[in-house]
Amino acid sequence: MGKKLVMAQKRGETRALCLGVAMVMCAVITYYILGTTMLPLYQKSVWTQESLCRLIETNIRDQEELEGKKVPQYPCLWVNVSAVGKWAVLYHTEETRDRNQQCSYIPGSLDNYQMALADVEKVRAKFHERQVFYCFSTTQENETSVLYQRLYGPQALLASLFWPTFLLTGGLLIIAMVKINRSLSILAAQK
């Protein structure tokens, strides 16, 4: 009976140790991937200065063409704001600015024109509700655009690092518990 219990304990310890090592390895790989993809985007982001923006005007523009999409037309929102003591164009994120500089907000689904127009109208109404809001600007003097939301801000970086940290901590705890269990069983066998 005692020998079977020891064999089962060794198998269980081996499996737990393999699980802990696998969790640590997955965390290390994920940290590497995040370090080569997300961290450079965070470091290169120039939109670091948080400013207070005041709404000046909003326009819904139709018949805009989006490069790379098969959708011939879509509505887009154009927003002018006053930020850092000057007029600026507000963009939803960095990607919105890169996709089409004529649009402040591009709806997510471009398949149905009426749904896209309703989405743009809803966003426009929210801007008119809140005339003053926080936005992100750059420290460059000649820049005439600001962002409503940063894609690669500190919150996004911390959110992406949560699960690898959780995996690493869990894996190290499992490995530590197996090692403690082994040392306690050796001490118990010696008595």
UniProtKB/Swiss-Prot annotation:
GO biological process, alphabetically ordered: detection of calcium ion
Pfam families cross-referenced by the UniProt entry: CaKB (PF03185)
Residue ranges, Extracellular side: 37-157
PTM statement from Swiss-Prot or TrEMBL: N-glycosylated.
Ranges annotated as spanning the membrane: 16-36, 158-178
Gene Ontology MF term list: calcium-activated potassium channel activity; potassium channel regulator activity
Cytoplasmic domain ranges by topology: 1-15, 179-191
GO CC terms in record: voltage-gated potassium channel complex
Predominant location: membrane
Residues with attached carbohydrate: 80, 142
Cellular location(s): Membrane
Entry keyword set: Glycoprotein, Ion channel, Ion transport, Membrane, Transmembrane, Transmembrane helix, Transport
Membrane topology: Multi-pass membrane protein
Record-linked PANTHER family: CALCIUM-ACTIVATED POTASSIUM CHANNEL SUBUNIT BETA (PTHR10258), CALCIUM-ACTIVATED POTASSIUM CHANNEL SUBUNIT BETA-1 (PTHR10258:SF1)
Family: Belongs to the KCNMB (TC 8.A.14.1) family. KCNMB1 subfamily.
Biological function: Regulatory subunit of the calcium activated potassium KCNMA1 (maxiK) channel. Modulates the calcium sensitivity and gating kinetics of KCNMA1, thereby contributing to KCNMA1 channel diversity. Increases the apparent Ca(2+)/voltage sensitivity of the KCNMA1 channel. It also modifies KCNMA1 channel kinetics and alters its pharmacological properties. It slows down the activation and the deactivation kinetics of the channel. Acts as a negative regulator of smooth muscle contraction by enhancing the calcium sensitivity to KCNMA1.
Subunit structure: Interacts with KCNMA1 tetramer. There are probably 4 molecules of KCMNB1 per KCNMA1 tetramer.
Name of the protein: Calcium-activated potassium channel subunit beta-1
Underlying gene: KCNMB1
